[in-house]
UniProtKB/Swiss-Prot annotation:
Gene3D superfamilies: 3.40.50.880. Pathway: Amino-acid biosynthesis; L-tryptophan biosynthesis; L-tryptophan from chorismate: step 1/5. The gene is trpG. The lineage of its organism: Archaea, Methanobacteriati, Methanobacteriota, Archaeoglobi, Archaeoglobales. This is Anthranilate synthase component 2. SUPFAM superfamilies: Class I glutamine amidotransferase-like. The keyword Lyase applies. GO terms for biological process: L-tryptophan biosynthetic process. It comes from Archaeoglobus fulgidus (strain ATCC 49558 / DSM 4304 / JCM 9628 / NBRC 100126 / VC-16).
Length: 178
């Protein structure tokens, strides 16, 4: 089972639908995320949402399961691990070409990838120990990875993103590969 932490974005249930193609999924609101401490699951997706990243979900990264952060979730990863998140030129409902390394969630995904973006904040400095695994054509960090922790600034669940279902399937497979 994959848990989606709902950070109140309108795309949350697109993520849920994609995940449900490959595994059971449960949605837990961010305000109730403490419930995860008592649950059994194979992976966590931290959803997009409005506002600024914070450290409220820091405990999730210590649970030993794969984590995928999307947009705000990606920014939370950077925030929790000491990276820097800040304002960038707003990009809402636009596509960009994203170059990636073809590993992890990007395995088997076309390169460059056309990805849907909806953000005005981004990772300006990645956390130490994380690799930048994807960047947009305008130089914005679009993917971070360290071990079982993965983040993407763009929205794989958007219809604007090519191979979004493939990326989610790759993540679910990682959750079951140990």
């Amino acid at each position: 089972m994959i848990v989606v932490v709902d950070c109140k974005d309108s795309f949350v249930y697109n993520l849920v639908e994609y995940i449900s193609l490959f595994d059971k999924v449960r949605v837990v609101e961010k305000e109730s995320a403490g419930l995860l401490r008592k649950m059994s699951f194979d992976g966590v997706v931290i959803s997009p949402g409005p506002g600024k990243p914070d450290r409220s979900l820091e405990f999730v990264f210590k649970m030993g399961v794969p984590v995928l952060g999307v947009c705000l979730g990606h920014q939370m990863i950077a925030e929790v691990f000491g990276g820097k998140v800040g304002r960038v030129e707003p990009v809402h409902g636009k596509t960009s070409l994203v170059e990636h390394d073809g590993r992890g969630i990007f395995k088997g995904v076309r390169n460059p990838l056309r990805a849907g973006r909806y953000h005005s904040l981004a990772v300006l400095e990645p956390p130490e120990g994380f690799e930048v695994c994807a960047k947009s054509e305008d130089g914005v960090v679009m993917g971070l990875r360290r071990g079982k922790i993965h983040g993407v600034q763009f929205h794989p669940e958007s219809v604007l993103t090519e191979d979004g279902v493939r990326m989610i399937r790759n993540f679910v497979e990682m959750c079951h590969d140990g």
